[in-house]
């Protein structure tokens, strides 16, 4: 009987370990929480700096986003309560604080990060403060320069697509982020009605461009 319990315990531990190892969140999320991001203005000059960190309170985990402007003055802070569920990091409560508008608490179900499925993109829909987004996570290949070193890497590309109408005019906002193992999110682009710019960039990133799998295999050699 004792051997049966030990065997059952070992099998349960193996199953738990297999599930835990299926998605390596620590390779993408924890590096992201230790990085500094620069946001340029329309002329390419530094507009603000964003820093991320993690906190645990009681049995809850939080991702803290702090935006600084000027001489180190905090202009906004967002606290995301989050959990991991299957292939995604999900926030179910957000506390948004702004120096001008005060604090507002939201309970939107937002996916902060998601792994693609093994052989196809992972897709979902979400509502962020009343705006509806169609989202996709997929594997792509990139050439990026980090710390002035050119690297060819497999990355996760996450897009959030929001189409809306003002009056009779149609508008579209497309957010595109690239995530890399051991670095987290390295850059986010925002395309507003066809005008694309980098809205948030890892401070150690020099450049990044998406390449084909054929180019990746050729250049990686």
Where are these regions (language model features)?
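Bacterial Sec-dependent N-terminal signal peptides
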Residues: 1-25
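Conserved functional acidic sites
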Residues: 21-221
């Amino acid at each position: 009987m004792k051997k049966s319990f030990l065997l059952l315990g070992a099998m349960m531990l193996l199953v738990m370990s297999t599930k835990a190892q299926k998605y390596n969140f620590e390779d993408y999320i924890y590096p992201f929480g230790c990085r500094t991001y620069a946001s340029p203005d329309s002329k390419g000059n530094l507009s603000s700096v964003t820093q991320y960190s993690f906190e645990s309170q009681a049995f809850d985990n939080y991702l803290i986003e702090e935006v600084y402007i000027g001489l180190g003055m905090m202009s906004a802070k967002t606290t995301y309560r989050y959990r991991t569920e299957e292939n995604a990091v999900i926030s179910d409560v957000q506390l948004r604080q702004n120096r001008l508008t005060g604090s507002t608490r939201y309970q939107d179900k937002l996916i902060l990060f998601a792994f693609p499925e093994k052989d196809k993109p992972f897709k979902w829909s979400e509502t962020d403060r009343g705006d509806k987004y169609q989202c996709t996570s997929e594997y792509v290949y990139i050439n990026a320069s980090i710390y002035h070193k050119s690297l060819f890497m497999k990355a996760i590309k996450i897009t959030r697509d929001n189409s809306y109408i003002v009056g009779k005019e149609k508008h579209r906002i497309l957010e595109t982020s690239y995530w890399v193992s051991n670095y987290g999110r390295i850059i986010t682009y925002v395309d507003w009605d066809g005008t694309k710019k980098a809205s948030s960039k890892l401070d150690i990133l020099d450049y990044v461009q998406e390449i084909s799998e054929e180019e990746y295999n050729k250049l990686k050699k």
